[in-house]
Amino acid sequence: MFRGASAINLDTKGRIAIPARYREPLQLEHQGRIVITVDIQSACLLLYPIHEWELIEAKLLKLSDTDKTQRSLKRMLLGYAHEVELDGNGRILLPPPLRQYANLDKRIMLVGQLNKFELWDEQAWLQQIDECQETIRGEELANNERLADFSL
């Protein structure tokens, strides 16, 4: 499971180094293979270990090619999907179209989301955190059916 936010750098060749604490599980459980695609609701990227991505692909396979919305979803997620592999130094290459989609510059945030990572431009991440806090403070959590029993 992946959790926590890590500040990392994008090098001049378009690579990022995955933090050391995640490398071993990625190598052992997923042979170092990761699929990167776009987030369809935010200007960030999603990084899925290969076995998690295969679950997404199985769901995508069930979507219709004749329904405009379903086809659009498939085009976005699959059209941008790139499989990459950790190199010997724990780095992965982010293809240019993906870097452009998420407006990635030198400073990046890698954010664990249990079964996947989000990859954000650092400034966009800070703005997103502010928006998340406003959303949480502005909503009565007890009125949200899925969050009614959630407590910390």
Curated annotation (Swiss-Prot):
GO molecular function: DNA-binding transcription factor activity; transcription cis-regulatory region binding
Main localization (coarse): cytoplasm
Organism domain of life: Bacteria
GO cellular component, one term: nucleoid
Membrane-spanning parts: none
Residues of the SpoVT-AbrB domain: 5-52, 81-124
Keyword entries, A-Z: Cytoplasm, DNA-binding, Repeat, Transcription, Transcription regulation
Signal peptide as annotated in the record: none
PROSITE patterns assigned to the protein according to its UniProt record, in alphabetical order: SPOVT_ABRB
Compartments where located: Cytoplasm, Nucleoid
GO biological process: negative regulation of DNA-templated transcription initiation
Keyword Repeat on entry: yes
UniProt similarity note: Belongs to the MraZ family.
Record text on subunit structure and interactions: Forms oligomers.
Protein known as: Transcriptional regulator MraZ
UniProt gene name: mraZ
